[in-house]
Amino acid sequence: MQSEANRHYLRASYDNKAIKILLVGCGGNGAQMLMGLASLDTALRAISSRSLHVTVVDDDTVSEANLGRQPFYPCDLGNSKARTMTERINLAHGLAWKAVHGRAPADVNVAAMDIVITCVDTAAARRAIGAAIDACEPEFHNLQPPAYWLDLGNRATDGQFIIGCPKASGDQPGRLPTVMEYFPELADESLAEDDAPSCSVAEALDRQSLFVNRVVASHALALLFDLLGRGSIGHAGAFLNLASGQALPIPLPTAPVEVAA
């Protein structure tokens, strides 16, 4: 049984509030996350004093290759992914979540968010988000950085999700490393990236397993439910492999992580 001391606890300031979430990306992982966040909002309202207000940002439109693996339909072809999914969620759940057809961080205010969730395809996109978060310096610009950064990523049959704390806060002595700290190679701009779009459903399924996004998103949502609904987590994410059926949790740091100067 895990020691109570080896857990990460949600800060008390998150009680009695609507937690502002920025969801970057509304494709494979992002659309699955958005649907799950709507369910999480319903659960939080029932068991706690918390709720969610989500802003979704994505500049992509629905293509034929997205059908099947992503929760879009033929009637959605050519439409904004962010607007299509957000309108559907708002209508079904009676919410007023916001969609931005654009890119983060250029078209949204990262500093206004409590949690940033990235469901992006490239290291460059993660670097841009990381730079925007790092630019939040309360003592100089009165900008409060997001308390958490949850990143999801996947390949053909495996994926991972990692939650971190970009900055330490007064009521949270330690923090969780972010995805940029777990994978410092993401900062290397010379690394080649494969973000070529698929042209058909068959090609998309050849590049990625049909349910890999759903599996990664479900595990990430379960972690968020423990953190926001139960108040603590015992791990910081996991590596998942659909081909082998294995899940390897990412342990919490054993000592507080110092914030880089």
Q: Where in this protein do the model-derived segments appear?
A:
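Glycine-rich phosphate/adenylate-binding loop
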Residues: 2-29, 33, 112, 122-126, ...
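Glycine-rich adenosine-cofactor-binding loop
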Residues: 17-47, 55-63
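Active-site catalytic pocket residues across diverse enzymes, especially alpha/beta-hydrolases
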Residues: 37-45, 71, 133-137, 228
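N-terminal Rossmann-like NAD(P) cofactor-binding subdomain of oxidoreductases
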Residues: 48-49, 57, 120, 153
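Glycine-rich phosphate-binding loop and adjoining beta1-alpha1-beta2 segment
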Residues: 50-94
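Conserved beta-strand segments of alpha/beta enzyme cores
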Residues: 53, 96-98, 148
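Conserved SAM/SAH-binding loop
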Residues: 100-107
